[in-house]
Amino acid sequence: MDPLPSFPGRPAIFDLASSPALTDALIEKLLHSERLEDFLHQALPLLTSRILGERDGIHASLLLLRPRRPALAVSSGDPAKALHETPGRFPGGPGMTALREGSPVRVGDTRTDRRWPAHLAVAVDHGIHSLLALPLEFGDEGQCVLSFCTTRPRDFPPAVVDSAAAVLDRGASVLHLAVRLDRYRVLEQDLRTAMSTRTAIDLAVGILMAQDRSDQTGAFALLKRASHYRNLPVRDVAVEIVERFSQRSPSTHFDA
């Protein structure tokens, strides 16, 4: 007799836990994703099939929380979407509890469990009877929780929870890498925006210095006064000055 529970369509637990194919598949999807959200949408069904196998009645969601960034959530169906947990919605549900405690949380039967009444009532309304939440920590770069819900009660016995956590751990490094790459991408965009803004302001200051025969400090003060009187950002006023002078918008050139 197999000592570990299984269900139709689910690969052998030990095969899943020992296979490096999950990491390779996640990396492939990361390489072909322009945005972090695109990657998570592609990663979610892959993680679901590798962890729980191919069968009906499974819905999954992934919630990513990062410092100073809005929560990012993806889901595989309406029931999972309805159960999304964010700090402002269901802040005390099984997913948030898993993140807070740093360990998996499971609900055997949403109709009889009394831990999260509001959240589980929504689950019951959508025909969901079992829940499993698996947390992942990315240090100071964020944390995420992968949640599964099914239409059958008691669908996640302890051995399945343990094997699911082990398989998810295989892909954790790629998920962390995706979060880190997105942070660098946002930083690059912010730097480009800042440099573009600086270019427009510097050009406008130079034009004002030439026209008014003033020094840099005086020209910038004039630019700020115009910004204040017109209730516009300094950059917008600077762009208008440059366009009026050169008949072209200012541009910043970046080396590839």
Residue ranges: model-predicted function:
Residues 2, 14-73, 84, 92, ...:
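Helix-loop-beta substructure at the N-terminus of cytosolic sensory domains
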Residues 3-9, 24, 161-172:
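Allosteric cytosolic regulatory segments
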Residues 14, 18-22, 31, 35, ...:
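Signal-transducing alpha-helical linker
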Residues 71-73, 79-117, 121-124, 129:
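Regulatory sensory and allosteric helical modules in signal-transduction proteins
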Residues 180-256:
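Signal-transducing coiled-coil/dimerization helices and immediately adjacent hinge/linker segments
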